[in-house]
């Protein structure tokens, strides 16, 4: 069906006392992203014309964390209930648009469910998201007459008879902007909490003869809110389980789905294998037949076909061509690039460095601000000395160079094609093509040398 224009209100003013944190509750993360950002993303994906974020506690922290230009910041100086929060946003509502109300601490609400709610909203009426619970204690009950929704009664205001009702309000609803403003203006705080409840607009709409249509979410987890860290951790597991299931069904081999975390977006080829305790962050692309060992962290990186990443390796903002091998215990920092068939071994760190085709850095090496050609051997203990305490400088190593162990290359410096650097050399000047560079002092030997002895 053709939908009206729509804006979204996200309630995010709560302090989150039960989180025992200085951080606003809605900024606590689920799958590496603030809870409220999940909700903002859903609103934007729905095509919201405007997103009104109602905030209170920790407003400065929220504004620092959320950089969405589509956000309209609405202050709720006093937290006097959900109806009061909506009243603060009401001046921004257009009469001819629909208003969808969401919550910053309900992070798993799906776009699919919200679209069904939007489609189900009757002309001039309200679309309401409800669920049935075996134990509805603490939640507002949905009242009906002849099957039609007539209102919502909060648990504290409900009679014993009403408390037997299992259908409860999730708090998520959609209505026309002009109607919403009119109903909000009629709210009172005549209840056990002394607050203005948004739920009271259901009864007001019913009294006007407006239709209220209830829609159920696909999964209960979509409407579960977070009030403490235990609830947040449970939703994290729900989310991760869902992501792992999708990946398994798409052909990714997760050795143990319960020990895999996706904190972003994973694009993958065929026959990808991921071992236990792997974390994927940001936007990651894995080519065909990629293998990732246990304990690895991959963030914002592209991994080419047939690459193998051994256990406990960290890869961030890096780009690997096909058939590269990394680790174990390697670290690729932002700007690291490996060309086809390159190898980075254990305890090797790269940053803003390119390792050419078939080149190898096997162990105990730092390569920073470096361009390394094809078929280069970097010996154990090699360091590109790229920083003088104020500025960074580049090291350039040509094709077919052999760098011996325990070499220091003091940038800026260039090593020509086919050159050899002897073990233990400190390179401070450019090395020509096919030359041997050696800076060790001649070895001397003193016969019968006696080591110093500590005085007692």
UniProtKB/Swiss-Prot annotation:
- Return the annotated region ranges for Linker: 230-250
Q: Which gene encodes it?
A: glmU
Q: Describe the family membership recorded for this protein in Swiss-Prot or TrEMBL.
A: In the N-terminal section; belongs to the N-acetylglucosamine-1-phosphate uridyltransferase family. In the C-terminal section; belongs to the transferase hexapeptide repeat family.
- Active site per UniProt: 363 (proton acceptor)
Pyrophosphorylase as annotated region, ranges: 1-229
Which species does the entry assign this protein to?
Escherichia coli (strain 55989 / EAEC)
Reaction catalyzed: alpha-D-glucosamine 1-phosphate + acetyl-CoA = N-acetyl-alpha-D-glucosamine 1-phosphate + CoA + H(+); N-acetyl-alpha-D-glucosamine 1-phosphate + UTP + H(+) = UDP-N-acetyl-alpha-D-glucosamine + diphosphate
Work out whether the entry's keyword set contains Transferase: yes
Q: How is the cofactor bound?
A: Binds 1 Mg(2+) ion per subunit.
Please state what the protein is called: Bifunctional protein GlmU
């Amino acid at each position: 069906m053709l939908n009206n224009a729509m804006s979204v209100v996200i309630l995010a003013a709560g302090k989150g006392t039960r989180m025992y944190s200085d951080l606003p509750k809605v900024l606590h993360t689920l799958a590496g992203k603030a809870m409220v950002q999940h909700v903002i993303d859903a609103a934007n994906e729905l095509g919201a014309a405007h997103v009104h974020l109602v905030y209170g506690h920790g407003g400065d922290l929220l504004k620092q964390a959320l950089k969405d230009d589509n956000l309209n910041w609405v202050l709720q100086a006093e937290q006097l209930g959900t109806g009061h929060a909506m009243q603060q946003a009401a001046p921004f509502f257009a009469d001819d648009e629909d208003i969808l109300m969401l919550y910053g601490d309900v992070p798993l609400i799906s776009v699919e469910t919200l679209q069904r709610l939007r489609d189900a909203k009757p002309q001039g009426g309200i679309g309401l998201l409800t669920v049935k619970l075996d134990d509805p204690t603490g939640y507002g009950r949905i009242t009906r007459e002849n099957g039609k929704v007539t209102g919502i009664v909060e648990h504290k205001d409900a009679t014993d008879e009403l408390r037997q009702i299992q259908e409860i309000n999730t708090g998520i609803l959609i209505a026309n902007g002009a109607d919403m403003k009119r109903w909000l203006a009629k709210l009172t705080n005549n209840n056990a909490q002394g607050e203005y409840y948004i739920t009271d607009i259901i009864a007001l709409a019913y009294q006007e003869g407006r239709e209220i249509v209830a829609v159920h979410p696909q999964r209960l987890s979509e409407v579960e809110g977070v009030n403490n860290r235990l609830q947040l951790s449970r939703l994290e597991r729900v989310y991760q389980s869902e992501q792992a299931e999708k990946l398994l069904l798409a052909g990714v081999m997760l050795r143990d789905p319960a020990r895999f975390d996706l904190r972003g977006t994973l694009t993958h080829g065929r026959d990808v294998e991921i071992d236990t305790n792997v974390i994927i962050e940001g936007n990651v692309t894995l080519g065909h037949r990629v293998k990732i060992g246990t304990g690895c962290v991959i963030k914002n990186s592209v991994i080419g076909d047939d690459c193998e990443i051994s256990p406990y390796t960290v890869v961030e903002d890096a780009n690997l061509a096909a058939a590269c091998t990394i680790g174990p215990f390697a670290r690729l920092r932002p700007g690291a690039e490996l060309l086809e068939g390159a190898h980075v071994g254990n305890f090797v760190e790269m940053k803003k460095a390119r390792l050419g085709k078939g080149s190898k850095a096997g162990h105990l090496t730092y390569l920073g601000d470096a361009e390394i050609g094809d078929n280069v051997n970097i010996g154990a203990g090699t360091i590109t000395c790229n920083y003088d305490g104020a500025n960074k400088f580049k090291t350039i190593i040509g094709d077919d160079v052999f760098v011996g162990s325990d070499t220091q290359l003091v940038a800026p410096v260039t090593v020509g094609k086919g050159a050899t650097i002897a073990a233990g050399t400190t390179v401070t000047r450019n090395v020509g093509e096919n030359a041997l560079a050696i800076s060790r002092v001649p070895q001397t030997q003193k016969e019968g040398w006696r080591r110093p002895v500590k005085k007692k």
